[in-house]
C-alpha cells in the first residue's frame, strides 16, 4: 500500500505541478481565436511560406493587457524587442532551449544561433536571427516579429506582435 500511495502522489505531483505553473504563468493572459479572415494570412510573408494557401491548423492569439504605467518606454520598436527578449529568455522557453542546446549545439553550422539566455535577452531579433536551432526570424517590423521553424520552413509561421494602445475607448 505504501508503494501505491507513493506512486499516486508522484503521478499527482508530476501532473498538477506543471498545470498549476501554467495557470499561474498565464493568469493575466486571455486566449482568443484568431480569425482566418485576418490580413496576416495574405501577407507577403504568409504567401511566401504558404504558397498553397493551406488553412491554418492552429491559430489562436494570446492577449495580455499591461497598464501603461508599468511600461518603461512607449517606443513601439523597443517594446516589441523587449517582448521578444522576455519570451525567448524567459522560463517558458528554458526547458526547450536547454534540450535543443544539448541535442544540436555541437553540430556544425550552428555557431551563429542564439543559445544562451543572456544572448536571447540582448538580441534585437532582426531578420535572419536563429534561435536554438529551431526558430528563424523571417520578418521584422516595429510592431511584430515573424518566425518559422528553422528546420521545416513549411511548418507554419509564429507571429509575435505588440500592439501599443494608449487609449482604449468603450
Q: Model regions: which residues?
A:
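Short, ordered beta-strand-loop transition motifs
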Residues: 54-57, 137-143, 163-168
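Generic detector of intrinsically disordered, low-complexity, polar/charged segments
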Residues: 6, 18, 83, 105-106, ...
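Beta-strand/loop substructures that line and gate deep hydrophobic ligand-binding cavities in soluble
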Residues: 151-170
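Residues in well-ordered beta-strands of folded domains
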Residues: 65, 138, 148, 161
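Terminal signal-anchor or tail-anchor transmembrane helices
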Residues: 2-30
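Mature, function-bearing regions of proteins
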Residues: 74-76, 110-120, 125-145, 151-154
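Hydrophobic ligand-binding cavity/cleft-lining segments
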Residues: 23-122
Amino acid at each position: 500500500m505504501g508503494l501505491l500511495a507513493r506512486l499516486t502522489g508522484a503521478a499527482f505531483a508530476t501532473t498538477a505541478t506543471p498545470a498549476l505553473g501554467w495557470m499561474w504563468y498565464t493568469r493575466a493572459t486571455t486566449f482568443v481565436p484568431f480569425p482566418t479572415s485576418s490580413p496576416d494570412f495574405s501577407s507577403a510573408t504568409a504567401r511566401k511560406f504558404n504558397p498553397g494557401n493551406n488553412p491554418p491548423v492552429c491559430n489562436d492569439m494570446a492577449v495580455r493587457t499591461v497598464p501603461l504605467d508599468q511600461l518603461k518606454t512607449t517606443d513601439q520598436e523597443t517594446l516589441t524587442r523587449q517582448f521578444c527578449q522576455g519570451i525567448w529568455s524567459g522560463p517558458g522557453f528554458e526547458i526547450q532551449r536547454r534540450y535543443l542546446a544539448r541535442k544540436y549545439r555541437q553540430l556544425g553550422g550552428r555557431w551563429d544561433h542564439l543559445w544562451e539566455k543572456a544572448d536571447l535577452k540582448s538580441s534585437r531579433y532582426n531578420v535572419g536571427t536563429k534561435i536554438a536551432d529551431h526558430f528563424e526570424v523571417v520578418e521584422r517590423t516595429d510592431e511584430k516579429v515573424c518566425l518559422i521553424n528553422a528546420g521545416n520552413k513549411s511548418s507554419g509561421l509564429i507571429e509575435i506582435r505588440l500592439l501599443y494602445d494608449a487609449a482604449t475607448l468603450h
